[in-house]
UniProtKB/Swiss-Prot annotation:
Transmembrane segments: none annotated. The keyword Lipid biosynthesis does not apply. Belongs to the phosphoribulokinase family. Pathway: Carbohydrate biosynthesis; Calvin cycle. Its EC number is 2.7.1.19. One of its GO terms (biological process) is reductive pentose-phosphate cycle. This is Phosphoribulokinase.
Length: 290
């Protein structure tokens, strides 16, 4: 299908590594002179930080110990779907920013833990780029996945995902190990029901697998490095993918299934550049013909 206003969505749980993938896309956009409009998934949370704490306390008092940022109740799924639909049809839409810390507060002019006002996406963009929790979400009321032309899943094995979240939340956000563990436990039902199913909707999944012991992520002192990892890359539709070329260009890579290639963790950026650049250029070419 020819789309005049293509959409790319990057989906992953908290601590999955979607921000690193976003940086690779930004490098490709810069090199290929692609102008992207950006949406951050946090912008479509329903509550700011103080409101979420209040709602969590209220739900806890009612006996609900699993009220989390992953669920439809705490996110603006209909509004997110609306922006995807609007951009796909007209190249326009509204978004905002969720301000996490003092540095972002200085940039956007609102206190940490709050949202900026809604504002229009930039004019004259080549495509829309979403990065967050729900870029391919499908429920009985919304279907965000249907509007994205290229859907990427970032899905480390679960223990590695937890290690990354623990380290990020402790070091960058000042939380204790106990607090992060409580968050992981509280989110688990919504993780199973609303995060995992998205990775059956994605076109490509990047799954990092550590080659060191991560049996107890809650006591791990270090995040396994790329040199201590392999990455499984699964393509939903491998038609048109030149696997022999990829195998020749990525040292020590191999195919584990007809639609899956395994690479050394240190070669992830190279693999993403080789796989994603042609797909992005295809979207731009179709845009020009639409």
């Amino acid at each position: 299908m020819l789309r005049k206003h293509p959409i790319i969505s990057i989906t992953g749980s908290s601590g999955a590594g979607t921000t690193s993938v976003k940086r690779t896309f930004e490098q490709i956009f810069r090199r290929e002179n692609v102008v992207a409009a950006y949406i951050e998934g946090d912008a479509f949370h329903r509550y700011n930080r103080a409101e979420m704490r209040t709602r969590m306390a209220e739900e806890s008092d009612k006996g609900n110990k699993h009220f989390s940022h992953f669920s439809p109740e705490t996110n603006l799924f209909a509004e997110l779907e609306g922006v995807f639909r609007s951009y796909g049809e007209t190249g326009t839409g509204n978004t905002r920013y969720y301000v996490h810390d003092d540095a972002e507060s200085a940039l956007h002019g609102v206190p940490p833990g709050t949202f900026t006002d809604w504002q229009p996406l930039p004019d004259a963009s080549d495509l829309l780029f979403y990065e967050g929790l729900h870029g391919a979400v499908v429920t009985d009321k919304v279907n965000v996945a249907q509007y994205a032309d290229l859907k990427i899943g970032v899905v480390p094995v679960i223990n590695l995902e937890w290690i990354q979240k623990l380290h990020r939340d402790r070091n960058a956000r000042g939380y204790s190990t106990e607090a992060v563990t409580d968050t992981i436990l509280r989110r688990m039902p919504d993780y199973v029901n609303y995060i995992c199913p998205q990775f059956a909707e994605t076109d490509i999944n990047f799954q990092r697998v550590p080659t060191v012991d991560t049996s107890n992520p809650f006591i791990s002192r270090w995040i396994p490095t790329p040199d201590e990892s392999m990455v499984v890359i699964r393509l939903k539709n491998p038609r048109g993918i030149d696997f022999p070329y990829l195998l020749s260009m990525i040292p020590s890579s191999f195919m584990s299934r007809a639609n899956s290639i395994v690479i050394h963790g240190s070669k992830l950026d190279l693999a993403m550049q080789l796989i994603l650049t042609p797909l992005i250029l295809q979207l731009i070419e179709r845009k020009k013909r639409a």
